[in-house]
Design a protein with these regions (language model features):
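Hydrophobic transmembrane alpha-helices and their immediate loop junctions
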Residues: 1-218
């Protein structure tokens, strides 16, 4: 597993995770600073939700790409990190533009530039659009799975305890990130999936969009 990551990649993933977790729970961090220790559970829930909604979304892209014979590495985006923190601070935690980094993909021939291993595939680029569709769909697909998982937990919760808080954060992040990324607009994931297979794209997009409309606009 370690051979699948470049030396800088793990620190980059941890930094992106921390920044997005801080942005997602910024208002509760302010509560902690002001002595409200009960807000710690919100920070922990945000960190777990970020791991499922953002980190696993990006790792979905990465490992499907590797499995298809490509080189894939996560790279932080400095301006994205700044924008994530600025929007969180400026809005007091009520609005967040979360874009701390992304997975970058290259042909396997580029492996020397990154210096780490990958699963080889003799079928690489047999159908570039098909490959691109599968890689692009992996992230929102993971968001959909976790959105359904957290929805079940949310509906089964009878009291507003830590589990319910985690389910709320998990729903917000997975539904928000997944539904946005499935919009058929370049360069989003949805554009690449819809371009190749509309029916397959709708199988992922419609449940995410439906949950977004219900939970965010209801």
């Amino acid at each position: 597993m370690s051979s699948q990551f470049s030396p800088r990649e793990i620190p980059s993933i941890i930094l992106a995770w921390a920044v997005l977790s801080i942005g997602l729970s910024y208002s509760f961090i302010l509560g902690l600073v002001n002595g409200n220790t009960s807000d710690l559970q919100y920070l922990i829930a945000a960190a777990i939700a970020t791991a499922t909604g953002f980190i696993l979304h990006e790792m979905g892209h990465k490992f499907v790409a590797i499995r298809r014979g490509y080189v894939a590495h996560f790279q932080i985006w400095i301006w994205g990190i700044a924008l994530t923190l600025i929007t969180a601070v400026a809005s007091g935690g009520s609005f967040l533009f979360g874009a701390p980094g992304a997975v970058y993909i290259a042909p396997a021939a580029a492996i020397g530039a990154y210096g780490y291993g990958y699963y080889s595939s003799n079928q690489q680029a047999a159908d570039p659009q098909q490959e691109n569709m599968l890689i692009s769909a992996a992230g929102p697909g993971i968001n959909l799975v976790f959105a359904i998982f957290f929805l079940v937990i949310y509906e089964l919760s009878t009291t507003y305890n830590f589990v319910a808080i985690l389910a709320t954060f998990g729903l917000e992040l997975n539904v928000g990130l997944g539904s946005f990324n499935m919009l058929p607009i370049p360069p989003l994931d949805g554009y690449k999936v819809f371009k190749k297979n509309i029916q397959f794209a709708l199988m992922i997009a419609l449940p995410l969009w439906g949950m977004f409309l219900y939970f965010f606009l209801h």
